């Protein structure tokens, strides 16, 4: 079978706490690992999406409404619904790894890097679909 869950592929989580949230695959593990003996992927996603901004909003309100709250997680392939979209993950690929999940402080640092990368892409107006809430 062809490997289509590659790094950079956007997917939707269908089970658990982050169900309905969009994620981007950072590192796929098709064969599994010792700690997770099943096909899984390291993903970075958006827990809280940015809100709509209009012309009448001031600078302070715009800054507050464009904030993004990210998450990083190991997700089973069975719980991912892949989409046709892709996203560049080079900005945070080196920071999010299996070692990131060992220490809470490392996890927080990785989240900060992911947040910065996501906010830069959102401000630039790229990948607009990824930054909009999934309506269902």
Curated annotation (Swiss-Prot):
Give the chief site where it resides. Answer: cytoplasm
SUPFAM superfamilies in UniProt: Translation proteins SH3-like domain
One GO cellular component term of this record is: cytosolic large ribosomal subunit
Keywords, sorted A to Z: Cytoplasm, Ribonucleoprotein, Ribosomal protein
Set out the biological process GO terms recorded for this chain's protein. cytoplasmic translation
Q: Name one GO molecular function term.
A: structural constituent of ribosome
Cell compartments where the protein resides: Cytoplasm
Xref: CDD domains: KOW_RPL27
Q: Which Pfam families match?
A: Ribosomal_L27e
Q: What is the protein's known function? A: Component of the ribosome, a large ribonucleoprotein complex responsible for the synthesis of proteins in the cell. The small ribosomal subunit (SSU) binds messenger RNAs (mRNAs) and translates the encoded message by selecting cognate aminoacyl-transfer RNA (tRNA) molecules. The large subunit (LSU) contains the ribosomal catalytic site termed the peptidyl transferase center (PTC), which catalyzes the formation of peptide bonds, thereby polymerizing the amino acids delivered by tRNAs into a polypeptide chain.
User: Remarks, anything else?
Assistant: Present with 7380 molecules/cell in log phase SD medium. There are 2 genes for eL27 in yeast.
Q: How does it assemble?
A: Component of the large ribosomal subunit (LSU). Mature yeast ribosomes consist of a small (40S) and a large (60S) subunit. The 40S small subunit contains 1 molecule of ribosomal RNA (18S rRNA) and 33 different proteins (encoded by 57 genes). The large 60S subunit contains 3 rRNA molecules (25S, 5.8S and 5S rRNA) and 46 different proteins (encoded by 81 genes).
Family per similarity comment: Belongs to the eukaryotic ribosomal protein eL27 family.
Name-wise, this protein is Large ribosomal subunit protein eL27A
What is the scientific name of the source organism?
A: Saccharomyces cerevisiae (strain ATCC 204508 / S288c) (Baker's yeast)
Please spell out the taxonomic lineage of the organism that makes this protein: Eukaryota, Fungi, Dikarya, Ascomycota, Saccharomycotina
């Amino acid at each position: 079978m062809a490997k289509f869950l590659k790094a950079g592929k956007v997917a939707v989580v269908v089970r658990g706490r982050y169900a309905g949230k969009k994620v981007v695959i950072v590192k796929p593990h098709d064969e599994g690992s010792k700690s997770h003996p099943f096909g899984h992927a390291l993903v970075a996603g958006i827990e809280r999406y940015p809100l709509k901004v209009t012309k009448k909003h001031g600078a302070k309100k715009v800054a507050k409404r464009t904030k993004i709250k990210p998450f990083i997680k190991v997700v089973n392939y069975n719980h991912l619904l892949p989409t046709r979209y892709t996203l560049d993950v080079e900005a945070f690929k080196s920071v999010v790894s299996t070692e990131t999940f060992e220490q809470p402080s490392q996890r927080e640092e990785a989240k900060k890097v992911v947040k910065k990368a996501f906010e830069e892409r959102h401000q630039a107006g790229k990948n607009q679909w990824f930054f909009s809430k999934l309506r269902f």
